[in-house]
Swiss-Prot record:
<feature type="active site" description="Proton acceptor">
    <location>
        <position position="285"/>
    </location>
</feature>
<keyword id="KW-0456">Lyase</keyword>
<dbReference type="InterPro" id="IPR017443">
    <property type="entry name" value="RuBisCO_lsu_fd_N"/>
</dbReference>
<feature type="modified residue" description="N6-carboxylysine">
    <location>
        <position position="192"/>
    </location>
</feature>
<keyword id="KW-0601">Photorespiration</keyword>
<dbReference type="InterPro" id="IPR020878">
    <property type="entry name" value="RuBisCo_large_chain_AS"/>
</dbReference>
<feature type="binding site">
    <location>
        <position position="286"/>
    </location>
    <ligand>
        <name>substrate</name>
    </ligand>
</feature>
<feature type="binding site">
    <location>
        <position position="194"/>
    </location>
    <ligand>
        <name>Mg(2+)</name>
    </ligand>
</feature>
<feature type="binding site">
    <location>
        <position position="168"/>
    </location>
    <ligand>
        <name>substrate</name>
    </ligand>
</feature>
<feature type="binding site" description="via carbamate group">
    <location>
        <position position="192"/>
    </location>
    <ligand>
        <name>Mg(2+)</name>
    </ligand>
</feature>
<feature type="modified residue" description="N6,N6,N6-trimethyllysine">
    <location>
        <position position="5"/>
    </location>
</feature>
<dbReference type="InterPro" id="IPR036376">
    <property type="entry name" value="RuBisCO_lsu_C_sf"/>
</dbReference>
<keyword id="KW-0560">Oxidoreductase</keyword>
<dbReference type="GO" id="GO:0009853">
    <property type="term" value="P:photorespiration"/>
</dbReference>
<dbReference type="Pfam" id="PF02788">
    <property type="entry name" value="RuBisCO_large_N"/>
</dbReference>
<comment type="similarity">
    <text>Belongs to the RuBisCO large chain family. Type I subfamily.</text>
</comment>
<protein>
    <recommendedName>
        <fullName>Ribulose bisphosphate carboxylase large chain</fullName>
        <ecNumber>4.1.1.39</ecNumber>
    </recommendedName>
</protein>
Length: 455
């Protein structure tokens, strides 16, 4: 017979390698695989490894021009998921050479680009990634990180407080700026553009930036504290986005914001580099994340999106609340909160962490708790998230019966009371409600808030 051995072949012959010892430079992935009936797990795992690296559906003669052993992804371990029939965790190792340096975009295109529509699988979910040191070092990461942010803001030893300005759509720029001023004047550290606020007919971005900057400087002068407003620079093109960031820098404001999933990783990394070069902090909103991470058996877990963001760059990222209106299981949430903040995180399956991750001194990201939280949640939030976090109360500030500024006062008083109680050694988990009640005795603003949002 002439030629090479053509034809469709079993993936597992080439791509299932249980004896493989993973290298320090490999990118490791943990996939939750649900094969179609009759497809053995080894074949399904191997198919994932193949389709997300060098494989194609049939043997091609150009395979002979390269070294498959050097470039192929390998499925090196498979384990059944306890309590689920026909679900498996497939571990895949990718050689580092398959990826462009410093590009989250390319990393995702390779690992999750094609394989999720694969016929042999009923469903596929990327649960976790281990990014090797060598690859982490090709990324700039967050523009500034937690420590630098605290130094810029001169705020230490407590979580930071924020508030999303509502109604999210429809306010004029001047009224918007007024709401910003009231919240900051009342005692919040930050206010935030809603993720949908870009540049719409009722409020163009330049007008908003101007009035928010005015609000910020006025509040700063009156309180003696550094204030910020996350100016949303997200736009339809990268060029327009940078134009907005440049204007923010010219106004001298401390922080801008970006929707990193809808904006895309290329745009996000571009903005992140600009922010580091120009001393702007970068707040990241995760609009669209639930499209990707909500299904338990298909898509990508948020911890992967969080890791990707730390590589691409951002100083704050929304990461669920554990207590408010959006779902988030406590241990799992704490797992990816640690992945955002810490330099080194040990493998811990009970918290959903499949791999030990070393960030080799890449700056950390502040997790932002936001969504349906109010003053009664403050002790729990302080305890769960600790000092390095941003607690965002949108309705929990603006919904105060006396207005925005008293709403801000209520939140700040509640926070300071919780931090003080914790520092005195009291247990926030069991005494939380009592701590808030005590504080509300001398703060009418807090008392009114406690009344509106009963525990």
């Amino acid at each position: 017979s002439v030629g090479f051995k053509a034809g469709v072949k079993d993936y597992k012959l080439t791509y299932y390698t249980p004896d493989y010892k993973t290298k320090d430079t490999d990118i490791l992935a943990a996939f939750r695989v649900t094969p179609q009936p009759g497809v053995p797990p080894e074949e399904a795992g191997a198919a994932v490894a193949a389709e997300s690296s060098t494989g194609t559906w049939t043997t091609v003669w150009t395979d002979g021009l390269t070294s498959l052993d050097r470039y192929k992804g390998r499925c090196y371990h498979i384990e059944p998921v306890p309590g689920e029939e026909s679900q498996f965790i497939a571990y895949v190792a990718y050689p580092l050479d398959l990826f462009e340096e410093g590009s989250v975009t390319n990393m995702f295109t390779s690992i999750v680009g094609n394989v999720f529509g694969f016929k042999a699988l009923r469903a596929l979910r990327l649960e976790d990634l281990r990014i090797p040191n060598a690859y982490v070092k090709t990324f700039q990461g967050p523009p500034h990180g937690i420590q630098v942010e605290r130094d810029k803001l001169n705020k230490y030893g407590r979580p930071l407080l924020g508030c999303t300005i509502k109604p999210k759509l429809g306010l004029s720029a001047k009224n918007y700026g007024r709401a910003v001023y009231e919240c900051l004047r009342g005692g919040l550290d930050f206010t935030k553009d809603d993720e949908n606020v870009n540049s719409q007919p009722f409020m163009r971005w330049r007008d908003r930036f101007l009035f928010c900057a005015e609000a910020l400087y006025k509040a700063q002068a009156e309180t003696g504290e550094i204030k910020g407003h996350y100016l949303n620079a997200t736009a339809g093109t990268c060029e327009e986005m940078i134009k907005r960031a440049v204007f923010a820098r010219e106004l001298g404001v401390p922080i801008v914001m970006h929707d990193y999933l809808t904006g895309g990783f290329t745009a996000n990394t571009t903005l992140s580099h600009y922010c580091r070069d120009n001393g702007l902090l970068l707040h990241i909103h995760r609009a669209m994340h639930a499209v990707i991470d909500r299904q338990k058996n298909h898509g990508m877990h948020f911890r992967v999106l969080a890791k990707a963001l730390r590589l691409s760059g951002g100083d704050h990222i929304h990461s669920g609340t554990v207590v408010g209106k959006l779902e988030g299981e406590r241990e799992i949430t704490l797992g990816f909160v640690d992945l955002l903040r810490d330099d080194f995180v040990e493998k811990d399956r009970s918290r959903g962490i499949y791999f030990t991750q070393d960030w080799v001194s890449l700056p950390g990201v502040l997790p932002v708790a936001s969504g349906g939280i109010h003053v009664w949640h403050m002790p729990a939030l302080t305890e769960i998230f600790g000092d390095d976090s941003v607690l965002q109360f949108g309705g929990g500030t603006l919904g105060h019966p006396w207005g925005n500024a008293p709403g801000a006062v209520a939140n700040r008083v509640a926070l300071e009371a919780c931090v003080q109680a914790r520092n005195e050694g009291r247990d926030l988990a069991s005494e939380g409600n009592q701590i808030i009640r005590e504080a509300s005795k001398w703060s009418p603003e807090l008392a009114a808030a406690c009344e509106v949002w009963k525990e």
